[in-house]
Amino acid sequence: MTHSLRVIFAGTPEFAAAALAAIHEAGFPVPLVLTQPDRPAGRGMKLQASAVKRYAFERGMAVAQPPSLRRAGKYPAEAVAALDLLHATPHDVMVVAAYGLLLPQEVLELPRHGCINIHASLLPRWRGAAPIHRAIEAGDAETGVTLMQMDAGLDTGAMLHEARVAIAPDDTTATLHDKLAAAGARLVVDALVELERTGALAATPQPADGVTYAEKIGKHEAALDWRKPAAALARQVRAFDPFPGGAGTLDGATLKLWAADAVPGRDDAAPGTIVDIGPDGVVIACGEGALRVTQLQKPGGKRLPAREFLAGAPLAVGQRFAPADAA
């Protein structure tokens, strides 16, 4: 099936690529794709294209990669060129998903139907850069995807559609990301079909209550504070998989702790102390309960199940991970 609604797409990572693929496969014309410039990545720090760029290039779509869209910003010449291209490209609506660049008011007002953002939370909860991580870290039972009509604020636009997604007890950011990406892809296609058919989408202002912000994830957040309850640390480990992981310092070496669950603890063990070692994992005392770690990684090594890790790097009951503020 083909459609007449012309969609400019702006996005960068895999989450956005899923939406672009769904829009393209549904038959909507995509005359232009915006994505961030290639970035150094991997051990060799070679320039790598974004997931959105790779998808668009493979299908012969026009791609632009401006470092900014702000005329008065750091890259005015590149911004002007990109804005001129947007003005010259006939389109009806812009779909934005994890693009990573600020859209100035000029861009927000350019499409006939405005700019629609795909946001990975149930707004107004978890506005901001890391909604998937923060939902898991906070212990939310569910999250979802919200389509909103973009305005000048940070994820403050009126809500158009939403899809709810349960957070499973073993969900990591990686697994929940994939669920939300699929939900967002379906949601935006349904919205575009409706927009084409009716000429408008019903918009509901976000409620003033329940606003929370999902701050960007920093590498320093990997450190586990063993004084916290084990349940909170288990959520932290899941929330920060694949980045930045959970981390603990043992005898001067930083170990990555990748998969973990909360188990009953011992009252006589100081937080951070290894209280049990077995084929199912390494059990570490916490401020409340204990954390059973089932996947570990030593510096320069690979992520391994506990049994394989212990075969090459034996640990002992009684060893103690350093406090987070002393690591």
Swiss-Prot record:
GO cellular component labels: cytosol
EC number: 2.1.2.9
Keywords on record: Protein biosynthesis, Transferase
GO molecular function (one): methionyl-tRNA formyltransferase activity
Organism of provenance: Burkholderia pseudomallei (strain 1710b)
Role summary: Attaches a formyl group to the free amino group of methionyl-tRNA(fMet). The formyl group appears to play a dual role in the initiator identity of N-formylmethionyl-tRNA by promoting its recognition by IF2 and preventing the misappropriation of this tRNA by the elongation apparatus.
Binding site for (6S)-5,6,7,8-tetrahydrofolate: S121, L122, L123, P124
Top-level division of the source organism's lineage: Bacteria
Entry-linked PANTHER family: METHIONYL-TRNA FORMYLTRANSFERASE, METHIONYL-TRNA FORMYLTRANSFERASE, MITOCHONDRIAL
Reactions catalysed: L-methionyl-tRNA(fMet) + (6R)-10-formyltetrahydrofolate = N-formyl-L-methionyl-tRNA(fMet) + (6S)-5,6,7,8-tetrahydrofolate + H(+)
UniProt keyword annotation of Transferase present: yes
UniProt record similarity statement: Belongs to the Fmt family.
Principal EC category: transferase
Protein name as catalogued: Methionyl-tRNA formyltransferase
InterPro entries: Fmt (IPR005794), Formyl_trans_C (IPR005793), Formyl_trans_C_sf (IPR037022), Formyl_transf_N (IPR002376), Formyl_transf_N_sf (IPR036477), Formyl_transferase-like_C_sf (IPR011034), GART_AS (IPR001555), Met-tRNA-FMT_C (IPR044135)
Keyword ATP-binding set for record: no
